[in-house]
Design a protein with these regions (language model features):
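C-terminal cap/linker of serine protease catalytic domains
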Residues: 1-21, 115, 164, 168-230, ...
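Conserved active-site neighborhood of the chymotrypsin/trypsin-like protease fold
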Residues: 4-9, 28, 33-121, 146, ...
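Active-site region of chymotrypsin-like
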Residues: 25-27, 84-97, 121-180, 184-192, ...
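Hydrophobic beta-strand signal
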Residues: 30, 49, 110, 128, ...
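A structural signal for short beta-strand/turn segments enriched in small hydrophobics and glycine
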Residues: 46, 106-112, 161, 166, ...
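Conserved PDZ fold ligand-binding element
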Residues: 47-49, 169, 244-267
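Gly/Ser-enriched beta-turn/beta-hairpin loop segments
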Residues: 75-82, 118, 130-146, 197-203, ...
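PDZ/PDZ-like domain micro-motif
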Residues: 157-160, 216-226, 239-257, 272
Length: 304
């Protein structure tokens, strides 16, 4: 009777890589004509998720694992969150399952992609960090990202990061220097957003309708007219008919807080706007000249 060799860690890793590719690979697509601009993943029948920055307009070619190349159109988008869902005939391509939990730092994961000529690609790495941030395609700060070390060539954004049994744990979105990559984590919040995009419900952010000067410029301008130094964002312009105009926010006002939290950067203001998307009311703390006042911004349905 032959001796049964124990499974080595390397053999177990190889088995997991093959499983990850075998399960997730058929769900991964190439975005754009060869060599392509990125990748995507089937998240529902006739629906493909990818990064918004992979598209130049509302249509694109999608190439599946079986070699089919089909024209797709955007059905739902979240440009600030760098996500779009495409409507396309997915044929026999399976929907990729979501992992029930996210991996912890140090855990192994696999990046699955599709090459420019339509072939499979799989690499492995570890979770090197969580709660990382980067800038989206329109400059807004995207937080909560999963940092990992699975190598990815250019043109891999939109591809999935999966666990050892091929379940979705993230969407590759940004590249850092020296071998680190960022993925949007496949958590409950992302799943909720993706399900809305699948239904054709594009995500829109609330817009104040103002032009702002950063804190350092605001300090200099206030000092030039003899006003006290105060951290905040200075209102330089107010658009006619905007939510800010209706609330009588004025040129020269200094926004120092929103929803009870300090505002010293544009990221602070964007974060506050995101928290009031449901209530559609933003309470600002403002310095007008030397006087501290409160300004309540009410957004109508057309303001997003």
């Amino acid at each position: 009777m032959a001796d049964v060799q124990p499974t080595t860690p390397l053999a177990a890793l190889s088995d997991a890589a093959r499983t990850a590719l075998g399960v997730a690979g058929p769900s991964v697509v190439r975005i754009g004509r060869a060599p392509g601009r990125g990748c995507g993943v089937v998240v529902a029948p006739d629906r493909v998720l990818t990064n918004a920055h992979n598209l130049r307009d509302g249509t694109t070619a999608v190439t599946f694992a079986d070699g089919r190349s089909v024209q797709a159109t955007v059905v739902g988008g979240d440009t600030d969150g760098d996500l779009v869902v495409l409507e396309v005939d997915t044929g026999e391509a399976p929907v990729l399952d979501w992992a029930p939990t996210l991996p912890e730092p140090g855990e192994v994961l696999f990046a699955v992609g599709r090459t420019g000529d339509g072939g499979d690609r799989v690499t492995f790495g570890i979770v090197s960090g969580r709660e990382r941030a980067f800038r989206g395609p329109r400059g807004r700060r995207i937080t909560g990202s999963l940092e990992h070390t699975a190598p990815l060539p250019r043109g891999s954004s939109g591809s999935p990061v999966v666990d050892g049994v091929g379940r979705l744990i993230g969407i590759n979105t940004a590249r850092l220097s020296e071998g680190f990559y960022l993925a949007l984590p496949a958590d409950a919040e992302l799943r909720h957003r993706v399900e809305a995009l699948v239904r054709g419900e594009s995500v829109a952010r609330l817009v104040l309708g103002v032009g702002l000067a950063p804190a350092e410029v605001a300090r200099q301008l206030r000092a030039s007219v003899g006003l006290a130094d105060q951290p905040g964002l200075l209102v330089r312009t107010v658009e006619d008919g905007s939510a800010a105009a209706r609330a009588d926010l004025r040129v020269g006002d200094l926004i120092t807080g929103a929803t009870g939290r300090p505002v010293t950067t544009l990221d602070d203001l964007h974060a506050a706007l995101d928290t009031v998307r449901a209530s559609r009311r933003l309470d600002l703390q403002v310095i007008r000249g030397a006087e501290a006042i409160a300004v309540a911004i009410a957004f109508d349905e057309a303001a997003s």
